[in-house]
Amino acid sequence: MRCAGIFTERFLIVSSSGFTFTRVKDQMIQQLLDMGIKDFRVLDALSQVPRHIFLDQALWSRAYENRALTIGYKQTISQPYIVARMTEHLLSHTSKRGKVLNHVLEIGSGCGYQSAVLSYFANDVCAVERI
């Protein structure tokens, strides 16, 4: 999965209804900092990946809340803190430069949000979901 870098070009941070996500994304990042996320690479990745596109459009206004949201099929997208913490923990075992992971296999990827975040740090991400 080659997601890194394409999101900001393809999905400008404004919805079709004109709602802007910039302020709420900034608030999400500040909240993650306040909750103890320290790796700025992780915070940068979360600020670049547009979480709202992984949700039904009816939930876009809640996309950057620090909570799990339903994605259908009795599943949820993980709250941003959990995504940040898992990614930060994974990166704590790697170097600090460039693409630090070669291959990542994510089992139970749901809508792909965590996979998109991981694509900022891995050469290849393979995501598997049972749906």
Spans of model-derived segments:
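Class I SAM-dependent transferase core
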Residues: 7, 11-103, 121
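Class I SAM-dependent methyltransferase core
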Residues: 106
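Conserved SAM/SAH-binding loop
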Residues: 111
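Aromatic pocket-lining residues of Rossmann-like dinucleotide-binding sites
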Residues: 118
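Conserved SAM-binding motif I beta-strand of class I
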Residues: 124-129
